[in-house]
A protein has these predicted regions:
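Glycine/Thr-rich phosphate-binding loops of Rossmann-like dinucleotide-binding domains
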Residues: 124, 150-151, 199
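Conserved helix-to-beta-strand junction in the class I
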Residues: 132-136, 143
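Short, glycine-/aromatic-enriched active-site segment of Class I SAM-dependent methyltransferases
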Residues: 21, 143-168
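A SAM-dependent methyltransferase catalytic signature shared across enzymes that methylate proteins
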Residues: 176-192
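Short proline/glycine-enriched turn/loop segments at secondary-structure junctions
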Residues: 187-188, 222-226
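Helix-to-beta-strand junctions that scaffold the AdoMet/dcAdoMet cofactor pocket
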Residues: 123-124, 137
Length: 238
């Protein structure tokens, strides 16, 4: 993995830029994310004895997930941003530990389940990153934003906002995300769309748009995602 590219992609998380734009590190979305994780695990009857999250942020996802797993399950979170690590340390316990580090600090074959949630789009050399993640555990669960749609291309401010406010370096469709995983050596076991945008409406305009998205999605899910966006991709891989 290119060390210069890695350093460039990590800079916003180390110099406080990301913290300034996202002061709670998206912790408020954690219960929703955990519900999507559990949906996938239950679909495949996966009951991990050990879980690692790469890019664990403020640590709330692992804390929320822990209460839904066997009490003996060991959970570890790795995060490169010191600000987030300090927040996550407050959430640690006997079976839940957080570390200041990245994918290179996780031992190969060290867990049953690796979580990589809303991380891939932030990594400059994302293909090198995916190759590193591949051998860390048995199952890998990715959550990837689908930023490219007809709407986002027509509204040029949409992708620019993803870059400047959310620090997305790469933009995906469902097909390009799945292809990237397959081309870096993964076997895709299952995937589904997640309503990561439509479930959160903080203005009446967004509520109207998201209601329309939900209606269209119920009829033509793939077409809705390609045209209107508003959904992300949850992928289980080996």
């Amino acid at each position: 993995m290119n060390t210069e590219a890695l350093a460039n992609s990590e800079r916003p998380y180390q110099d406080g830029s990301y913290l300034e734009q996202n002061p709670d590190w998206h912790a408020y979305r954690s219960p929703w994310k955990v519900s999507q994780i559990l949906k996938m695990l239950r679909r495949h009857q996966i009951a991990p004895a050990s879980v690692v999250e790469i890019g664990s942020g403020a640590g709330e996802v692992l804390l929320q997930l822990q209460s839904n797993l066997d009490p003996s399950c060991e959970l570890r979170g790795y995060e490169i941003a010191e600000h987030a690590v300090q927040l996550s340390l407050q959430r640690g316990n006997e079976k839940l530990h957080y570390f200041h580090g990245g994918v290179e600090d996780v031992r190969d074959n060290s867990c049953d389940l690796v979580l990589v949630l809303d991380v891939v789009e932030h990594v400059e050399d994302y293909r090198g990153f995916l190759r590193q993640v591949r051998n860390k555990g048995t199952f890998k669960l990715f959550h990837i934003p689908l930023d490219i749609s007809v709407q986002s291309v027509l509204r040029t401010s949409s992708l620019r906002q993803r870059r400047t406010e959310n620090f997305h370096l790469h933009f995906f469709t469902k097909d390009t995300a799945l292809q990237a995983l397959e081309e870096t050596g993964y076997e895709v076991v299952d995937w589904f769309y997640t309503p990561g945008t439509v479930d959160f409406s903080d203005t009446w305009r967004k509520w109207l748009l998201n209601s329309f998205r939900k209606l269209c999605f119920a009829i033509r899910p793939d077409l809705t995602v390609r045209v209107l966006s508003g959904y992300q991709l949850m992928v289980l891989a080996k």
